[in-house]
């Protein structure tokens, strides 16, 4: 009886080893580089000195943090087109708004 137990444990261990080598990770499997006959001919025709174009960088450009503040940029609105977003208050309008609020409280 002890012999049968030892025999059953050995095949299980060997199966786990095989599975472990076949299925490593849970993620997406890596794409295997396949060489088709059509692409092999094109590759041999290319010049070895030709450098492939590098991929464009993603995300924010490196120097974008060093831009000037919003005050230095001049916003030009074309006539006949509504400005987008919340309208900006000018200093004159802010003073008028304060004076109107105080007069309403008095009444």
UniProtKB/Swiss-Prot annotation:
Tell me the protein's name: High mobility group protein HMG-I/HMG-Y
Post-translational modification Symmetric dimethylarginine, affected residues:
26
Residues recorded as bearing Phosphothreonine in the entry: 39, 53, 78
Residues bearing N6-acetyllysine are: 7, 15
Composition bias (Acidic residues) maps to 93-107
Q: Where is the composition biased (Basic and acidic residues)?
A: 15-24
Taxonomy of the source species = Eukaryota, Metazoa, Chordata, Craniata, Vertebrata
Q: What does this protein do?
A: HMG-I/Y bind preferentially to the minor groove of A+T rich regions in double-stranded DNA. It is suggested that these proteins could function in nucleosome phasing and in the 3'-end processing of mRNA transcripts. They are also involved in the transcription regulation of genes containing, or in close proximity to A+T-rich regions.
Subcellular location(s): the record lists: Nucleus; Chromosome
Q: Quaternary form?
A: Interacts with HIPK2.
Q: Where is the composition biased (Polar residues)?
A: 1-13
Q: A GO term (biological process) for this protein?
A: negative regulation of DNA-templated transcription
- In chain numbering, cross-link Glycyl lysine isopeptide (Lys-Gly) (interchain with G-Cter in SUMO2) is at 15
* Modification type Phosphoserine: residues: 9, 36, 44, 49, 99, 102-103
Residues the record lists as Asymmetric dimethylarginine modifications? 26, 58, 60
Where does this protein have compositionally biased stretches of type Basic residues? 55-74
Q: Does the keyword Transmembrane apply?
A: no
> Which modifications occur after translation, per UniProt?
Isoforms HMG-I and HMG-Y can be phosphorylated by HIPK2. Phosphorylation may modulate DNA-binding affinity. Methylation at Arg-58 is mutually exclusive with methylation at Arg-60.
Residues where Omega-N-methylarginine is found: 26, 58, 60
Q: Which family does it belong to?
A: Belongs to the HMGA family.
A GO cellular component annotation here is:
SUMO ligase complex
Q: Which GO terms describe its molecular function?
A: 5'-deoxyribose-5-phosphate lyase activity; chromatin binding; cis-regulatory region sequence-specific DNA binding; D-loop DNA binding; DNA binding; DNA binding, bending; DNA-(apurinic or apyrimidinic site) endonuclease activity; enzyme binding
């Amino acid at each position: 009886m002890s012999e049968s137990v030892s025999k059953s444990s050995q095949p299980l261990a060997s199966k786990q080893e095989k599975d472990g080598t076949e299925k490593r990770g849970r993620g997406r499997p890596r794409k295997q580089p396949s060489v088709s006959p059509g692409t092999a001919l094109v590759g041999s025709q290319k010049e070895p000195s030709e450098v492939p174009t590098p991929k464009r960088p993603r995300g924010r450009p490196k120097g974008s943090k060093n831009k000037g503040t919003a005050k230095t940029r001049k916003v030009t609105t074309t006539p006949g087109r509504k400005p987008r977003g919340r309208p900006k208050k000018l200093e004159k309008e802010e003073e008028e708004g304060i004076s109107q609020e105080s007069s309403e409280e008095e009444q």
